[in-house]
């Protein structure tokens, strides 16, 4: 039987099922490099403050480096009987340097140790995530540059509303992902904090130097309150909340890619690299990757709700419930990083069917607003113009024609304000080009949006 580091107070050992139920090493293994990093900073501080001798600190540090080397070579076997990542690492350190390993835990608790590990882990994830989001935003901007003059229907209620530029549609997602970027960047602020030195909850009687470990671990600052340091999981909840918003945006884009790639729309074709086939229908090309991203949004939402539910009833400070804070964080990190990479690949390699997109703007009544605006610009109150055009649309539907096919004679019977220039106004390209209000779909407006985005991406 492996001796528990906390076993002195107990007369009996855990039974096997209970031991397995309470062990977290099955999912904590990815914290190993961060646990060792935290321990190296801690032992350096212990040595420099004289809490242990310089010789002891050097021996422990060298032992930790050897454990780190074994970890990198895949020579570490994680054992359930050692419970968690901390005790697994300390056991290997003990194998390297003997009983001196026990001095590493001076002025430290697993409570501040695990919090430190998670702050370090999430800082690393956020760094990778911000890079991935920047890459996706760049891809969207580059795609937009190529499609400023590509027309498509804009939708409300999934019905044709007004003609727009495809670039305008894409740049709407650029804005969403930029907000995601900003949220995760702010998330770094609350993650970049050092809990090490808070010990179990009340600090320590040893003359530790928390500023030193803060600098060694490259944290922005140390927690100001030891109880908050060991019980705070807001930084993870922020991450999960931000991840949920990101997955919602990715899911919305996936839904549109699924629609656009359907036979009925045929606006885009996704690359074979991001599609699969059917085991029974030879003709099928299924947009599975877009469907998977859409589906995986649910698990990220679930991870957020799971931790919120865990946290809502916890008194200060540490409770074993907090063991449930990791798997959802790990899963969400894996999910969003992979989803971002797959989305970037899908957008980079998809084929845009410009002809079908533009044709779709001509075989509808999405130019009805142009006619109403045309009449309003000539002095007719917009509400009256709206009523007249609505009646005309109904007449056209009954006749099986579109507004651009109505004769000038019939137009002038509707209103003497209408002249021959109305046919130019009714063209989709004209309709789009005229909408150059700030943020509008006009070609000049979109170019300004793209230029602004390029400046933002250079920061």
Swiss-Prot record:
It comes from the Bacteria. Its main location: cytoplasm. This is Argininosuccinate lyase. GO terms for cellular component: cytosol. Transmembrane segments: none annotated. Disulfide bonds: none annotated. CDD domains: Argininosuccinate_lyase. Belongs to the lyase 1 family. Argininosuccinate lyase subfamily. HAMAP family: Arg_succ_lyase. The gene is argH. Keywords: Amino-acid biosynthesis, Arginine biosynthesis, Cytoplasm, Lyase. It is an enzyme of class 4 (lyase). One of its GO terms (molecular function) is argininosuccinate lyase activity. It catalyses: 2-(N(omega)-L-arginino)succinate = fumarate + L-arginine.
């Amino acid at each position: 039987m492996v001796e528990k580091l906390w076993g002195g107070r107990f007369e009996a050992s855990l039974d096997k099922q209970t031991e397995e139920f309470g062990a977290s090493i099955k999912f904590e293994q990815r914290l190993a490099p961060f646990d060792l990093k935290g321990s190296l900073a801690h032992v350096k501080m212990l040595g420099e403050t004289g809490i242990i001798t310089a010789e002891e600190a050097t021996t422990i540090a060298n032992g930790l480096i050897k454990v780190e080397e074994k970890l990198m070579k895949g020579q570490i076997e994680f054992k359930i009987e050692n419970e968690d990542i901390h005790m697994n690492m300390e056991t290997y350190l003990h194998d390297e340097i003997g009983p001196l390993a026990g001095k590493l835990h001076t002025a430290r608790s697993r409570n501040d140790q695990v919090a430190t590990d998670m702050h370090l882990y999430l800082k690393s994830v956020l760094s990778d995530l911000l890079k991935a989001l920047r890459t996706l935003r760049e891809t969207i901007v580059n795609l937009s540059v190529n499609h400023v003059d590509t027309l498509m229907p804009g939708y409300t209620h999934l019905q044709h509303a007004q003609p727009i530029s495809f670039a305008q549609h894409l740049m709407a997602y650029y804005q969403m992902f930029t907000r995601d970027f900003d949220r995760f960047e702010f998330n770094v602020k609350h993650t970049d904090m050092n809990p090490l030195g808070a010990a179990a909850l009340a600090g320590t009687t040893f003359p530790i130097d928390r500023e030193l470990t803060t600098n060694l671990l490259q944290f922005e600052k140390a927690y100001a309150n030891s109880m908050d340091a060991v019980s705070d999981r807001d930084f993870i909840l922020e991450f999960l909340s931000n991840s949920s918003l990101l997955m919602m945006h990715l899911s919305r884009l996936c839904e549109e890619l699924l629609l656009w790639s359907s036979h009925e729309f045929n606006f885009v074709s996704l690359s074979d690299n991001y599609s699969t086939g059917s085991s029974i229908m030879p003709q099928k090309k299924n947009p599975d990757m877009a469907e998977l991203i859409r589906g995986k949004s649910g698990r990220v939402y679930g991870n957020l709700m799971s931790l919120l539910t865990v946290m809502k009833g916890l008194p200060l400070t540490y409770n074993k419930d907090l063991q449930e804070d990791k798997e959802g964080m790990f899963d969400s990190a894996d999910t969003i990083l992979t989803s971002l990479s797959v989305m970037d690949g899908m957008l980079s390699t998809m084929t845009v069917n410009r002809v079908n997109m533009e044709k779709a703007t001509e075989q509808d009544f999405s130019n009805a607003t142009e006619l109403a605006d045309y009449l309003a610009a000539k002095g007719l109150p917009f509400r009256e113009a709206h009523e007249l055009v609505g009646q005309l649309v109904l007449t056209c539907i009954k006749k099986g024609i579109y507004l651009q096919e109505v004769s000038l004679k019939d137009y002038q019977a509707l209103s003497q304000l209408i002249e021959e220039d109305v046919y130019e106004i009714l063209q989709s390209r004209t309709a789009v080009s005229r909408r150059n209000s700030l943020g509008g779909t006009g070609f000049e407006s979109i170019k300004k949006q793209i230029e602004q985005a390029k400046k933002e991406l250079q920061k």
